[in-house]
Amino acid sequence: MGLVEAFGHVSARLPEGGFMITATRPLPGARAAEVLQLSDEGEIISGEAELLPLETPLHVAIYAARPDVGALCRTHSPHAVAWGARSAVPPLVIGLDGLSGEIALHDDTDLVVEIAAGAAAASSMGDADCLLIRANGNICSGGLLSEAVVRAWFLEQRAANASRIGDAAPLEGEQLARRSRHYDVELVRAWRWCRAQFGDRDQL
């Protein structure tokens, strides 16, 4: 999908508590057997400790602060990174890019490797759907893993389109309210497209 290179991780909350998180392997070659199972506090239940992402505390803190969040995608997609480096939210200039959801900013440039730093990032995120971390990528949330993936994809599209188009008037207020009433349906369709492009066509 072009959202991660060597770095990036994905997690999903478990119904019985805790969550699963991908290992520190390049995601295109990730194997199910390498996914780690963690407690709500980030303690390893199953999986290899050396494969645990450094920024696991970021996931722990957001899940603790946001019971509505069921999955997180941590990426370093290039256009979103550029907007984060400017400490600026890319304006919404293309209606479909609103599938990114609400975007917040976090000004700390360090890796989120301690729970206090994770709590600070979660506080910056508030009720937003995505968080741009200054000079350090982004993290996107969803009630389901499919929603988090779609938001990560459209965050990058939104950032790229805002950079390309420049000074176009953004969608906001009544225009955005009218356009956004279709987002729930479009998100489902966008997930099917992602699966067709990058996943298993037999499971669409």
Model-derived segments and spans:
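Short acidic/polar capping segments at secondary-structure boundaries
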Residues: 26-27, 77-80, 109-112, 127, ...
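Structural motif
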Residues: 18-20, 70-73, 80, 102-104, ...
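Divalent metal-coordination and catalytic microenvironments
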Residues: 12, 62, 76, 121, ...
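A mid-sequence, solvent-exposed acidic-amphipathic segment
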Residues: 114-126
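Class I SAM-dependent methyltransferase SAM-binding "motif I" and its flanking Rossmann-like core
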Residues: 75-117
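A conserved C-terminal secondary-structure "cap"
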Residues: 127-204
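An anion-binding catalytic pocket shared by soluble metabolic enzymes
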Residues: 1-73, 80-91
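Conserved active-site and cofactor/substrate-binding residues in soluble primary-metabolism enzymes
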Residues: 5-7, 30, 53, 57, ...
